[in-house]
């Protein structure tokens, strides 16, 4: 995967900035990493005169997100065809997303939102916590 492909795949999966890429990298690979947002910037932009080597674990993260994305989209399309969609909301933050859909725990809210865009969902509303949810 070259730098341009990596950038498009990151954007496709809701990782829009070098900081978001490194933050998610650290979620997946909990051991200490030597990489920072400057490295991620080079992974997505390359160097002016040549391609920049992308860390293999970063590529594996993109591949993992693509696999999850494909599975979620396929299942939701089946539910839509049956008239029983599961995903009906947009979320303003990860905690709300994770409380409603445990299958997205530790995934960025932008990942979920990008799936909604790809599914062509236009009738979504924002998810709001009820008072009961906040108290429990």
Label the model's feature ranges.
Residues 1, 53-60, 107-110:
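Alpha-helix boundary/N-cap detector
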Residues 1-20:
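A short, Lys/Arg-rich alpha-helix, primarily the initiator
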Residues 10-11, 22-25, 50:
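Secondary-structure-rich domain cores
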Residues 19-22, 38:
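Residues within the helices of the helix-turn-helix
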Residues 44, 62-66, 77:
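Residue-level detector of alpha-helical secondary structure
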Residues 50-71:
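DNA major-groove recognition helix of helix-turn-helix/homeodomain DNA-binding modules
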Residues 70-136:
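Helix-turn-helix/homeodomain-like alpha-helical modules used for DNA recognition
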């Amino acid at each position: 995967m070259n730098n341009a492909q990596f950038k498009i795949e990151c954007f496709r999966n809701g990782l829009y900035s070098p900081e978001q890429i490194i933050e998610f990298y650290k979620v997946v690979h909990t051991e200490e990493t030597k990489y920072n947002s400057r490295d991620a910037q080079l992974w997505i932009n390359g160097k002016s005169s040549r391609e920049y080597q992308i860390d293999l674990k970063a590529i594996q993260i993109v591949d993992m997100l693509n696999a999850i994305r494909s599975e979620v989209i396929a299942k939701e399309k089946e539910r839509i065809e049956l008239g029983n969609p599961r995903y009906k909301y947009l979320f303003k933050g990860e905690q709300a997303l994770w409380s409603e859909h445990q299958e997205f725990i530790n995934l960025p809210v932008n990942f979920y939102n990008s799936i909604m865009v790809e599914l062509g969902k236009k009738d979504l509303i924002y998810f709001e916590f009820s008072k009961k949810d906040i108290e429990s």
